[in-house]
Design a protein with these regions (language model features):
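Gly/Pro-rich hinge or "lid" segments in bacterial periplasmic/extracellular proteins
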Residues: 54, 63-65, 73-74, 80-151, ...
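Active-site-proximal beta-strand/loop segments in catalytic clefts of secreted hydrolases
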Residues: 4-5, 80-81, 138, 157, ...
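Extracytoplasmic/secreted envelope proteins and their assembly/folding machinery
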Residues: 18-26, 65, 88, 121, ...
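Short basic (Lys/Arg) and small-residue
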Residues: 8
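Local pocket/hinge segments that shape ligand/substrate recognition
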Residues: 34, 38, 146, 178-184
């Protein structure tokens, strides 16, 4: 059972609720969404029932849900299928982050800065597709006074040579790929 801290709000000022977590987890684990990392909820009671199929691949329990309940606005109750020694590590993974139902009903909720709502330290200011995503400090973040970087730019590139060049000349501080010929 988890109790949310007081004063948590989304970047648009609405309160973060236990219901946001319950909705997000049910959504991420659902066969309908088939999220890439939805399997990470397999440790939560109810997941196996959600994904049980007959020999033809038809879901046996279309109404099954995770055993995750918002007891009130601030209290989330979670029942795992078994003891999970790495539970806290799972909770740190983005698949476990809350999302609001009214926000994700918009297809562009995660790709359009005008509809992007979050509760983390940064929010999306702009996204130039195939170029750069710019994040800015979220003034509504519960610990905003401790966030020292005002802006973060994520440069997007499929070209490992371009990435390495930008890293070497100091334009980029971090890259996630290097050209194969640079690996010894």
């Amino acid at each position: 059972t988890y109790t949310l801290r007081d004063g948590l709000v989304w970047s648009d000022g609405q309160p973060v609720t236990a219901g946001d977590f319950a909705f997000a987890w049910q959504r991420a684990a659902s066969p309908e969404l088939a999220a890439d990392y939805g399997y990470m909820f397999e440790v939560v009671d109810g997941y196996a029932d959600m994904w049980a199929t007959d020999d033809d691949g038809n879901f046996l329990n279309p109404d099954a849900q995770l055993n995750v309940v918002a007891l009130d606005e601030k209290t989330l109750q979670v029942t795992t299928a078994n003891y999970v020694a790495y539970w806290n590590e799972l909770l740190a993974f983005p698949t476990y982050f809350p999302v609001r139902e009214d926000v994700v009903s918009n297809d562009a909720w995660a790709t359009d800065p005008s509809t992007y709502v979050c509760n983390g330290p940064y929010t999306m200011e702009s996204w130039e597709h195939n170029s750069v995503i710019t994040l800015v400090k979220n003034p509504n973040f519960y610990d905003a006074n401790e966030i020292t970087m005002e802006t973060i730019n994520f440069y997007l590139s499929d070209d490992a040579n371009n990435m390495l060049s930008n890293f070497k000349n100091g334009d980029w501080e971090l890259i996630d790929d290097v050209p194969t010929n640079e690996i010894t």
